[in-house]
Amino acid sequence: MGEFIHTNFLVKVNLSNYLKIKNKIPSNVNILAVSKGFKSQEIKTIQNIGQNDFGESKVQEAYEKQLLLKDLKQIKWHFIGRIQSNKIRKIVQNFKYIHSVDSFEK
């Protein structure tokens, strides 16, 4: 229970900071919210105030959130973690953007 309260507090602090800078950045700049470790309800809260880009580095954790939040069509999922060859298909199918490449196989 204490961990949830602590996490919830951090989300509130970050939302406050987010709202302060949101209107100060140019319109062609997107904020990428790293949602690793946050619950789907917390993602929904920040998405409701206009944050649509979310970064995840763990494929299975991200996939579970994507299923729970599939009705929020505005969300753009970014994969920001190390790519493992056995997870490439799932990454390509479930993320709009991929920001990392681990290695090229010959």
Question: For the regions a protein language model found, what residue spans apply to each?
Answer:
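Conserved alpha/beta-domain cores
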Residues: F4-K106
